Amino acid sequence: MVRTDDQPYVPTPIDRLFSHSYVRTQLAFQLDDVSGCATLLRRGMERLIRTSPFLSRELTIHMNDDQTESITTKPISPQELDRMLKIKHHEKPLRQALIEASNDRDCLDDKFMPTSFHRLDVSQPCPVMVVQANIHPDGVLLAVATNHMVMDATGQGIAVQCLADCCRLEQGDVVSLPTCSADQDRGRELLLHELPARIVNREFSEYRPCRDLYSQSAALADLAHKAATTIRVAHFTIAAEHVHALKTRCNEMLSQVFESNGHVFGADDAPWISSSDVVIALIWRSINCARYQALTTTQQPPEKQAKKDSGEVVHVGIPVNVRSRVSPVLPGSYMGNGAILVLVPQPLRTFSGTDWMSTICRVGLAVRTRLAAITSDEIRSLLHYILNAPDPIAFSFDVADYFVSNWRQMGFYEADFGSKMGKPQRIRNPDGVVGGTVFIMPKRSQPENAPWELQVSLTDEMLRLLDQDDVWATYVRPDTYWP
């Protein structure tokens, strides 16, 4: 890792897949007494910078004379802490202030976020991590933004937990911090030099050719600008007992469903799906049926029937954390980008008919089968392809019809800031860039049967149609905390 001013930064193969945007998260703490929170967070951030120098850097993209790009990095000095931590005091209670700003995304950004998701001048230095502590009379809204060029959502969750531990140390608690600097160096070394050695003659349709970071960032900014007026982020919950019941029923049905089509399974290779697979299948099925309402009706006009029978394929894109899937594995506290995108295709006709349980079985198994195929060899092949493709490739929203990001195992709710602030009670990603973007939010450890939390980005019309879907209405409930 670069440790001196204005040094070149060599992106890892996975870094190259992401544009110059920010992963942004809001953590809400409802508190009786907010005095001293700003001081605690400032001291915690100062300690975090000493512990994890990687987080206290800025990145700058340069366009060279030969039209190639280069990236440089330099540290933010302790005297410039305000570039990493912004403190803003608000007169109104937390939820009231959010509700009043919720109809204007630019206003929400200006008041509550440390940096914009998309309004970035990529030629200017941009911090790896920047935090804004919004101090309200009844709590703190901690807004965290991390630069996706070098850091993914899992890395952000690790950084938030490290910040929380640093705040606890400032309060005298005994906390063991990970060896963050060594882990960042080791993770980059693996991704740059040790892992990209698997050579296969194939392309990866999950990504698109990309001219440069400038054009890529401009395209993303255009999408985000359009979404600000057309896409709404809605929040939902699914009771844990509903998820368990659906998973149990699916696993009971799977062999029967596939044996009816001539598949025979032995005792050791019987198909199975996880709770997350079931939730993804339920989401995919319900949004698809809202988008193509004719799928579940028996009386269909000819053009709708033709569409259903045409063999059209729909895709869901699922980011997959590869830290533990590669060999050798990446360090557990590696904060850099460690996620790749996989596509799960399904014929549109899979979602037709009224036997929705069989649909969830089939779709859930398709998700499980694709995720199980993400081996170390496939990941290494992708890394090699990124480094040797004739043109740069990058993530693009046009590769799938829907995207489901599973944050279930990210430890945001376990970030304990100590006796002064405790753990966050609510978490959200405030950005819905395109319609059909879904987040399965982090799991709560308490209570044990806490509901699953979902965040869905759709147009108002699609949300209305989704609400009319009988299966969705049976299992999913609105979460009204976030406006």
Curated annotation (Swiss-Prot):
Q: In which pathway does it act?
A: Secondary metabolite biosynthesis
> Could you tell me the superkingdom of the organism this chain comes from?
Eukaryota
* UniProt keyword Plastid present: no
Pfam families named in the record: Transferase (PF02458)
InterPro entries xrefs? CAT-like_dom_sf (IPR023213), Sec_Metabolite_Acyltrans (IPR051283)
Give the UniProt keywords, A-Z: Acyltransferase, Transferase
Per the UniProt record, which EC number(s) apply here?
2.3.1.-
Observed effect of gene inactivation: Blocks the production of protubonine B and leads to the accumulation of protubonine C and protubonine D.
Q: Which GO terms describe its molecular function?
A: acyltransferase activity
Q: Which family does it belong to?
A: Belongs to the fumigaclavine B O-acetyltransferase family.
Assembly behavior = Monomer.
What is its biological role? O-acetyltransferase; part of the gene cluster that mediates the biosynthesis of protubonine B, a hydroxylated and diacetylated cyclo-L-Trp-L-Leu derivative. The first step of the protubonine B synthesis is performed by the nonribosomal peptide synthetase pboA that catalyzes the formation of cyclo-L-Trp-L-Leu by condensing L-Leu with L-Trp.
Question: Could you tell me what this protein is called?
Answer: O-acetyltransferase pboB
Give the organism the record lists.
Aspergillus ustus
